[in-house]
């Protein structure tokens, strides 16, 4: 497990564990979400992410350990909607209730002014859909309405569980811009995902879990630095070139099994110059770019590795005869959102 200490925590998990009968969902999980960060909570499906988020929010009682939100247990916060906005599932919207009425109901429940409902519709770009029933909304529109609900209390923290699921690229881009703008206002985001590439462009920190345990936490900058591009060099005397490079301060050098050396932190021109000075002939050089998604998969590999010849797991298999592909979900366009803390976004509504 690799752990890097960071700034003060908006959210802190301390030894969280959860046992569901014979299933150990989370085991001794500890991590922090720094204040003002966008932290990606990453892991394969079934790795304990949703259970952990629900424990943080007091929706599931942990078997062991505890957690803190802004320094205190969540259940002790007097006005939780003003501290934490939660986006767990957009399927809980009443299909016969309009977007505006939905927000008014929740505004009344948490004790904020009725006018806040219209403001939040404007914030997420749903003003023109205020009088439409939620049951007619596309997945992207439902997700925006769920975010508007979470924002009613003007929270300091947003917690989102797999918010990109089912969204098309335009919807994902809108969500990314929205969360970046929220964090730029000095607030904190914890967003879960089973794919690093979905959140890589917006997160500043990552917490990676597998089988309900921590495998990595730290900043994205540190993760990128640890897996930066390398120059793979084939030459007449690898050992001599490595020694010459080390003398110039280039120490990220690895001897590969095929006789080449992998060099980090030096550009081709520098390596060529050092090789010439050391009287080493370079036969070829190629830059190896590291795919962070592959790094993430390596961290979490093995969680669901299938046994050879195992076929379908019990209860799973081909659908019975007569079941076709699911129908396409209609995507209704809406006007572009306007987000006051960083200005209008480019492009249209969700899909």
Segments predicted by a language model, with ranges:
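ABC transporter nucleotide-binding domains
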Residues: 6-210, 216
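Structural motif detector for alpha-helix initiation sites
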Residues: 35, 99, 220, 289-292
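ABC-family P-loop ATPase nucleotide-binding domain
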Residues: 1-17, 302-351
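Non-catalytic alpha-helical coupling and interface elements of nucleotide-dependent molecular machines
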Residues: 108-111, 204, 250, 297, ...
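Short acidic-hydrophobic catalytic motif
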Residues: 221-225
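Short Pro/Gly-enriched coil loops immediately N-terminal to beta-strands
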Residues: 81, 227-228
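Short amphipathic beta-strand starts and helix->beta connectors
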Residues: 214-219, 245-249
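Short, charged/small-residue-rich alpha-helical element at the C-terminal edge
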Residues: 228-302
């Amino acid at each position: 497990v690799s752990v890097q200490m960071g700034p003060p925590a908006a959210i802190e998990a301390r030894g969280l564990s959860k046992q569901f009968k014979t299933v150990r969902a989370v085991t001794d999980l500890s991590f922090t979400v720094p204040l003002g960060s966008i932290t990606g909570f990453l892991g394969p499906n079934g790795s304990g992410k949703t259970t952990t988020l629900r424990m943080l929010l007091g929706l599931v009682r942990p078997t062991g350990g505890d957690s803190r939100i802004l320094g205190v247990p969540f259940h002790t916060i007097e006005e939780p909607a003003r501290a934490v906005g939660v986006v767990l599932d957009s399927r809980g919207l009443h299909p016969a209730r309009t977007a505006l009425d939905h927000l008014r109901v929740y505004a009344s429940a948490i004790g904020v002014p009725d006018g806040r409902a219209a403001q939040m519709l404007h914030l997420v770009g749903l003003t023109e859909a205020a009088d439409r029933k939620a049951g007619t909304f596309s997945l992207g529109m439902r997700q925006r309405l769920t975010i508007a609900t979470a924002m009613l209390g003007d929270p300091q923290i947003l917690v989102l569980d797999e918010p990109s699921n089912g969204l098309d690229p335009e919807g994902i881009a809108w969500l990314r811009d929205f969360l970046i703008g929220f964090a730029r206002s000095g607030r904190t985001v914890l967003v879960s995902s089973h794919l690093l590439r979905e959140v890589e462009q917006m997160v500043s920190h990552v917490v990676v879990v597998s089988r309900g345990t921590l495998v990595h936490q730290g900043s994205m900058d540190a993760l990128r630095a640890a897996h930066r591009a390398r120059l793979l060099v084939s030459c007449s005397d690898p050992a001599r070139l490595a020694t010459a490079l080390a003398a110039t301060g280039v120490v990220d050098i690895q001897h590969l099994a095929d006789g080449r050396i992998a060099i980090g932190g030096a550009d081709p021109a520098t390596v060529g110059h050092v090789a010439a000075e050391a009287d080493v002939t370079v036969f070829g050089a190629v830059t190896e770019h590291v795919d962070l998604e592959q790094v993430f998969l390596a961290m979490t590999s093995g969680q669901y590795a299938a046994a050879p010849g195992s076929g379908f797991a019990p209860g799973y298999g081909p659908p019975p005869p007569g079941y076709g592909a699911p129908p396409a979900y209609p995507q209704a366009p809406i006007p572009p959102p306007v987000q006051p803390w960083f200005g209008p976004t480019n492009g249209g509504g969700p899909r």
